[in-house]
């Protein structure tokens, strides 16, 4: 999960709309939220970020640059719908949507003590995608 990217506005807005939290609350959270990630995710929220990293990695393997992709999405009631676009745009939107919905489901696991968590404290095996 990287919040310093071109799709920051869309992903950040999605996070705010679905969770009520600032998108910055997830930047630097645990072992996976923010730039890179390794070892064992700390909790369900961190697992959402690991899954998001895996989703982006899959897009990159198909020659897409998800961190540079911009997309449109719509919020109808509480439902996110990705707009039309090329496969990279729609794929990036789908990854971001899945992460945001995961954050919403994992809201009870969120711990302030994992904000800006030192990556050097991350332990265990890195799970596969």
Language-model segments: residues:
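Extended terminal accessory/targeting regions
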Residues: 1-129
């Amino acid at each position: 999960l990287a919040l310093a990217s071109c799709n920051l506005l869309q992903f950040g807005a999605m996070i705010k709309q679905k969770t009520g939290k600032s998108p910055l609350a997830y930047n630097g959270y645990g072992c996976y939220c923010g730039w890179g990630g390794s070892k064992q995710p700390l909790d369900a929220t961190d697992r959402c970020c690991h899954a998001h990293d895996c989703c982006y990695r899959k897009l990159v393997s198909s020659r897409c640059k998800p961190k540079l992709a911009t997309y449109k999405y719509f919020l109808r009631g509480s439902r996110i719908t990705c707009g039309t676009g090329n496969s990279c745009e729609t794929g990036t939107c789908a990854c971001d949507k899945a992460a945001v919905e995961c954050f919403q489901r994992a809201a009870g696991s969120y711990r302030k003590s994992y904000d800006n968590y030192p990556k050097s404290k991350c332990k265990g095996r890195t799970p596969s995608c």
